[in-house]
């Protein structure tokens, strides 16, 4: 068996095209285009790359993208004041504060200061709570993007055993909630998990998000499993690899996400979908 690659680049382009058509229809109907505010604090090179791709993607679909770059020396009060200003701006549908924030800033406090209806990253406890209660609105971007990939490839989830490796607030925990909502029996593995291999060998759906290159041996993959690799790691050679040993895993899996070109593009596509949804559902006037 050789796994079929799940093409995140292709699906993300499809999602972007769908959103662009909705934006065009809005504007033709005399309504304003959705607005996204992207806030970057400091000059972290990786964050600058991510922010640049998000801003470009927004402009490509016809959003109004507003950039707010604060120096690394900015105070937490200055950031909270900016967020409050954006909360009250009727032209802004989504607020994205790029993480990580500089040391000394309270990330939880900053994320909680974003109005839940403008929380297009889906990190606010209110939005995570809605997902836990099976009434999601704005959903965490990477898990939402993964569900979109699985749906677009018509991969059945109901009744399947899903194993999630990694329990971060950004991917692992909301991913568990998404798969539970989709009808899976879920197992979440983390640093204290005993017999990781035993859990992985039982997975019909495996989602790995730990940030360690080739952390999961391909030989552990159950025959016919669906493998979603969220990791993106650069080796000393410069090559980008995921958290799963891809070459071996693809000989056992039925579907697998490559790195790069799998999950990554879907995170930005989900951000765009969330901003569109916030505009249509919460901020429809004008």
Curated annotation (Swiss-Prot):
One of its GO terms (cellular component) is cytosol. Keywords: Amino-acid biosynthesis, Histidine biosynthesis, Hydrolase, Methionine biosynthesis, Multifunctional enzyme, NADP, One-carbon metabolism, Oxidoreductase, Purine biosynthesis. Belongs to the tetrahydrofolate dehydrogenase/cyclohydrolase family. It catalyses: (6R)-5,10-methylene-5,6,7,8-tetrahydrofolate + NADP(+) = (6R)-5,10-methenyltetrahydrofolate + NADPH; (6R)-5,10-methenyltetrahydrofolate + H2O = (6R)-10-formyltetrahydrofolate + H(+). Pfam families: THF_DHG_CYH, THF_DHG_CYH_C. NADP(+) binds at residues 166-168, 232. Its EC number is 1.5.1.5, 3.5.4.9. Catalyzes the oxidation of 5,10-methylenetetrahydrofolate to 5,10-methenyltetrahydrofolate and then the hydrolysis of 5,10-methenyltetrahydrofolate to 10-formyltetrahydrofolate. One of its GO terms (biological process) is tetrahydrofolate interconversion. Homodimer. Pathway: One-carbon metabolism; tetrahydrofolate interconversion. This is Bifunctional protein FolD. GO terms for molecular function: methenyltetrahydrofolate cyclohydrolase activity; methylenetetrahydrofolate dehydrogenase (NADP+) activity. The keyword Amino-acid biosynthesis applies. PANTHER family: C-1-TETRAHYDROFOLATE SYNTHASE, CYTOPLASMIC, C-1-TETRAHYDROFOLATE SYNTHASE, CYTOPLASMIC-RELATED.
């Amino acid at each position: 068996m050789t796994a079929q690659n799940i093409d995140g680049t292709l699906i993300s382009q499809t999602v972007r095209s769908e959103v662009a058509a909705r934006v065009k229809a809005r504007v033709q109907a005399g309504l304003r285009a959705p607005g996204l505010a992207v806030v970057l604090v400091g000059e972290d090179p990786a964050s600058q790359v991510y922010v640049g791709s998000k801003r470009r993607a927004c402009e490509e679909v016809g959003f109004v993208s507003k950039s707010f770059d604060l120096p690394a020396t900015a105070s937490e009060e200055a950031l909270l004041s900016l967020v409050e200003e954006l909360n009250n701006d009727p032209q802004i549908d989504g607020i994205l504060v790029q993480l990580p924030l500089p040391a000394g800033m309270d990330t939880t406090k900053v994320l909680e200061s974003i109005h839940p209806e403008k929380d297009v990253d889906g990190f606010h406890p209110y939005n995570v709570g809605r997902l836990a209660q099976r009434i999601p609105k704005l959903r965490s971007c990477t898990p939402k993007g993964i569900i979109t990939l699985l749906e677009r490839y018509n991969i059945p989830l109901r009744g399947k055993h899903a194993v999630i490796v990694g329990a971060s607030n950004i991917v692992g925990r909301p991913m568990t909630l998404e798969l539970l909502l989709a009808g899976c029996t879920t197992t979440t593995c983390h640093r204290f998990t005993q017999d990781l291999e035993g859990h992985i060998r039982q997975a019909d759906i495996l989602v790995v998000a730990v940030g360690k290159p080739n952390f999961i041996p391909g030989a552990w993959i159950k025959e016919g499993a669906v493998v979603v690799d969220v990791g993106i790691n650069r080796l000393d050679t410069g090559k980008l690899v995921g958290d799963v040993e891809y070459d071996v895993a693809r000989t056992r899996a039925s579907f697998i996400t490559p790195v790069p070109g799998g999950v990554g593009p879907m995170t930005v596509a989900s951000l765009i979908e969330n901003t569109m949804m916030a505009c249509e559902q919460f901020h429809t006037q004008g």
